A protein has these predicted regions:
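Extended, solvent-exposed regions of the mature portions of secreted/cell-surface glycoproteins
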Residues: 88-185, 411
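Short amphipathic beta-strand and strand-loop transition segments with alternating hydrophobic
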Residues: 94-101, 271-277, 325-328
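Extended hydrophobic-aromatic, low-complexity segments
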Residues: 87, 216-219, 246-248, 298, ...
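Acidic glycine-/aspartate-rich tracts in secreted/extracellular proteins
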Residues: 84-85, 213, 241-243, 525-526, ...
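Extended surface/linker regions that mediate inter-domain or inter-protein docking
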Residues: 1-86, 174, 184-202, 210, ...
């Protein structure tokens, strides 16, 4: 029996955002703190190095993890080392940081929070700068006004000694102005969550960076200077925890993610109005576009394309138009008239969406690089024959996708938000194979996440290559539909108007909507025969047994 208290660096709740739940060695061990009792620094599978190696597809303790595919960027340390609360090493934090700016003023608001420290003062932009706050001691918080600019620095000074305890840089962002911001979905911070920044070591850092063949003893491949690091005490000489600069050699700077760099002005598009929306008419869209720093001219953008899809019961119409040159300025807004009309037989409500980006210069540490600054895609439902617009049902919440993927951005990074993806990945969308494979959203996402457990695999052929998802391993429990679904959208029966899926590589095509949802995961012949015998040309009878509250309801057969 020992009195040792494990460090609180990464919480179980954070692990369970993907692992759902974390459970190893017969499911007995279910927390990082428990795991680290055995996987301690005396072993070649010490926990910190082991976890880094597993998630970065490396090697640890003689085990090869090269087949592991991490669902987001491995450089984003705060996916696991979730921050946002004061620690002993960093007693002052700003929430949010970066501060949200959606009005183009370049100025935001944040809340400063501090831990239990003795008498102190907080000054602006210099050790003797303008006084912001002064307290005799203890934890607390104070909101700033709307004057935070990129690079605002708060100095936390000890009033007794006059020494600066911490310098905190706060920036601004436009991420989150339209939808849930990439990277905003984080776990629960541990009490020592900044340990990754203030305790660099050769073993822990090398467990991720072993692919570059760094030899700390000789200095080989350890920077262009071949720096020798005989022990961990030398790491902090170059790799200070945090400098306030992006993409430098500080621990935080070296792991700065491009998508939330303060150097990106952001692209904020707001749909103001859609008119001329009767069947057969070409819609007219009024919109605004700006960055955190001010207005943007559409013609100057690298890309700005509007999407119209519908009807919102389930999409089978899709049009995409470049709006940059055709937009006309009216006051502070812009107006674009679609060239393509709505179908003559259009009914109900339709949806307007977009994809857009700028290319901007970013100082990435040792060079200026042109990088994409991508807009978050707003969506707007508009009425065609409905009295008022009826949005498409929400099947999944993109925040749940981001819980594991953190910055889910596909097709060059410009397609974000699962509820925008469905505007293109509709029931009739297929790849270029012969016969074709469905890339309908539910069929595709179910199959990708089922991966190696599929009986028949899943391969998508596109013009730029063939993509085989048959070896993917889902890190959680696939029976937990709520990991992705919202509003009981996985329950049967599905709403009226949901369309069949074109599935030419499956047993028959099209596959009726309820069967398509089930057979995309349960892809064996037995399941297909069962679905087929309970389907007729005019409908499905799945809900007779699998409906909500029935003896074999979706919840019951997926109980976990």
């Amino acid at each position: 029996m020992y009195d040792a208290v494990p460090r609180d660096i990464v919480t179980t709740a954070t692990c369970n955002r993907c692992h759902d739940p974390l459970a190893m060695h017969g499911s007995r061990w279910q927390s990082p703190q428990a795991c680290s009792q055995c996987h301690n620094p005396t072993r070649n599978t010490r926990f910190d190095a082991l976890i880094h190696a597993v998630h970065s597809a490396g090697e640890a303790g003689g085990h090869d993890f090269s087949e592991i595919e991490y669902p987001t960027d491995i450089k984003d340390c705060q996916v696991c080392h979730t921050g946002g609360t004061p620690t002993d090493a960093f007693p002052l934090v700003a929430t949010p940081n970066a501060a949200l700016v959606c009005d183009g003023t370049g100025r935001g608001t944040t809340m400063l929070e501090w831990g239990d420290i003795d008498s102190f003062e907080i000054r602006l932009n210099a050790v003797d700068g303008t006084l912001f706050a002064k307290y005799p001691g203890g934890p607390g918080s104070q909101e700033t006004g709307k004057w935070i600019e990129d690079g605002t620095v708060f100095y936390l000074n000890d009033m007794a000694s006059g020494e600066t305890i911490q310098k905190l840089t706060v920036n601004n962002t436009a991420l989150g102005c339209v939808s849930n911001a990439p990277g905003a979905s984080r776990g629960e911070p541990g009490a020592q969550h900044t340990n990754w920044m203030d305790h660099p070591s050769r073993v822990v850092c090398g467990s991720c960076h072993d692919h570059s063949d760094v030899n700390f003893e000789t200095g080989e491949n350890h920077s262009e200077f071949g720096i020798v690091a005989p022990d961990d005490n030398t790491c902090g000489n170059c790799h200070v925890p945090y400098s306030g600069k992006e993409f430098d050699r500080s621990v935080a700077g070296a792991h700065q993610m491009l998508y939330n760099s303060a150097q990106l002005p952001g692209v904020i598009v707001e749909f103001k109005e859609v008119t001329n929306t009767n069947p057969g008419d070409a819609p007219i869209v009024t919109y605004s576009v700006k960055s955190k720093k001010g207005k943007i001219i559409p013609a100057d953008m690298n890309r700005l394309r509007f999407v119209i899809t519908g009807p919102n019961e389930d999409y089978d119409f899709y049009v995409l138009e470049d709006v940059r040159s055709g937009s006309v300025q009216v006051g502070d807004d812009w107006v674009y008239s679609f060239n393509t009309p709505l179908p003559m037989d259009a009914e109900g409500s339709f949806t307007l969406g977009l994809e857009g980006r700028n290319v901007v210069p970013v100082d990435v540490g040792n060079e200026i690089s042109d990088e994409r600054d991508v807009a978050e895609p707003p969506r707007l439902a508009f009425a065609v024959t409905d009295a008022t617009a009826v949005p498409r049902r929400m099947v999944v919440d993109d925040a749940k996708c981001e819980s594991c993927h953190v910055n889910l951005a596909l097709h060059g990074g410009g397609r974000r938000d699962a509820n925008y993806c469905i505007t293109c990945h509709s029931p009739g969308l297929v790849d270029i194979a012969t016969p074709s494979e469905s890339v309908h959203m539910k069929w595709m996402v179910h199959k990708i996440h089922r991966g190696e457990d599929l009986e028949n695999g899943y391969v998508v052929v596109r013009s730029r290559g063939t993509f085989d998802f048959s070896d993917k391993v889902y890190p959680g429990d696939l029976r937990n539909c709520d990991a992705c679904h919202v509003n009981n959208s996985q329950q049967l029966p599905l709403p009226d108007g949901v369309l069949p899926t074109i599935t030419e590589q499956a047993w028959w095509s099209p596959t009726m909507p309820q069967a398509a949802a089930c057979l995309s995961c349960h892809d064996g012949d037995d399941a297909a025969v069962h679905a087929y015998t309970n389907t007729t040309f005019f409908g499905e009878s799945c809900s007779t047994c699998h409906g909500e509250g029935k003896f074999a309801s979706v919840d019951r057969v997926h109980a976990h």
